């Protein structure tokens, strides 16, 4: 269980990812749950196993009451369970005691957090509330499960040398020019530039999205251990905050998805939303592919430069839930700026 960091908060979903009164299954730290949202926007979660004969509740449907609340209905024998896990047995017309223990959810605006079945060992980061206040939601993408453990997933996301290998086919990155790493314990910021090889004109004409790729990618990654990495990017028409989320589904299976937010400087920026989402999806798919090609537990005999992000993840993972004195800051850039409108 320690490999899934019990006591850490996990962002299970954004409300935009849920359809009203449509059950959805998800896994967290070795347990399966069903989640649903009623017409009032209230979100509930129960164990996904029907206590009668074990059917998957997420394969059922929702029934709505006159007051707008809803229940999830088992697809096997049509037993309906309310948000507390109670049901009414046929012929009794009386609600039972709870047959399941609801999963505690912490709703912050449209963000649905949970500590699973564990007592909180760290606070929920507030940065996404700031992002939602100053940016508009473009959408979500790349919601997939990858057959890898949480630590390996996090090491990949904080490996500042992997872009010119893993993401070569899209960005054609030629080198990593690392500038600064700011270690603030469970929060960190990384700044680096990624020069890219140019696409030819006929390649761009065949794929117009490529016109958006800059000659040099100026990367600012804002990291909130263990569940969130935000790529802050800017184009002439606006800014983007590409939020990568991570959730340990089981010891060797990790879910990831992207929430994309934008801040427009030009009306045309709103037309580019699907393009930015497509780029995000390709990035996640490339990461998933390389993670499927690793030999697990192979010893690292070579150490590259700019591996400070890996060291940061390993330190926090090993010491969790204790906070270790920050000791990995390097570089001479100014401190990270606060979120502004």
Language-model regions: role of each:
Residues 11-130, 341:
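Rieske [2Fe-2S] iron-sulfur-binding domain
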Residues 124-341:
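C-terminal catalytic domain of Rieske-type non-heme iron oxygenases
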Residues 9-13, 34, 44, 111-113, ...:
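Ordered hydrophobic segments in well-structured contexts
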């Amino acid at each position: 269980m320690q490999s899934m960091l019990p006591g850490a908060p996990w962002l299970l979903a954004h409300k935009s990812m849920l359809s009203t009164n449509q059950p959805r299954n998800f896994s967290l730290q070795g347990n399966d749950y069903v989640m649903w949202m009623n017409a009032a926007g209230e979100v509930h979660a129960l164990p996904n196993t029907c206590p009668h004969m074990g059917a998957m509740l997420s394969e059922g449907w929702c029934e709505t009451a006159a007051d707008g609340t809803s229940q999830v209905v088992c697809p096997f024998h049509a037993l309906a369970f309310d948000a507390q896990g109670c049901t009414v047995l046929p012929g009794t017309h009386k609600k039972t005691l709870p047959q399941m223990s609801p999963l505690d959810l912490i709703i912050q605006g449209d963000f649905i957090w949970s500590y699973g079945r564990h007592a909180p060992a760290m606070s929920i980061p507030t940065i996404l509330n700031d992002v939602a206040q100053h940016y508009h939601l473009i959408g979500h993408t790349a919601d997939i499960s990858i057959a890898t453990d949480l630590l390996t997933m996090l090491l990949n996301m904080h490996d500042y040398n992997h872009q010119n290998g893993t993401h070569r086919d899209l960005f054609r990155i030629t080198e990593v020019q690392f500038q600064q790493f700011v270690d603030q314990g469970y929060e960190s910021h990384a700044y680096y530039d990624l020069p890219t090889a140019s696409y030819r004109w006929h390649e761009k004409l065949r794929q117009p999205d490529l016109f958006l790729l800059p000659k040099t990618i100026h990367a600012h990654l804002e990291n909130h251990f263990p569940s969130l990495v935000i790529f802050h990017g800017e184009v002439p028409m606006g800014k983007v905050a590409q939020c990568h989320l991570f959730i340990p589904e089981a010891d060797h299976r990790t879910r990831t998805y992207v929430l994309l937010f934008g801040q427009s400087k030009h009306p045309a920026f709103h037309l580019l939303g699907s393009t930015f989402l497509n780029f995000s999806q390709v990035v996640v798919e490339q990461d998933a592919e390389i993670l499927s090609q690793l030999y697990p537990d192979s010893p690292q005999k070579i150490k590259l430069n700019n591996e400070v992000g890996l060291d940061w993840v390993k330190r926090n993972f090993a010491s969790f839930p204790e906070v270790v004195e920050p000791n990995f800051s390097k570089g001479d850039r100014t401190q990270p700026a606060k979120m502004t409108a």
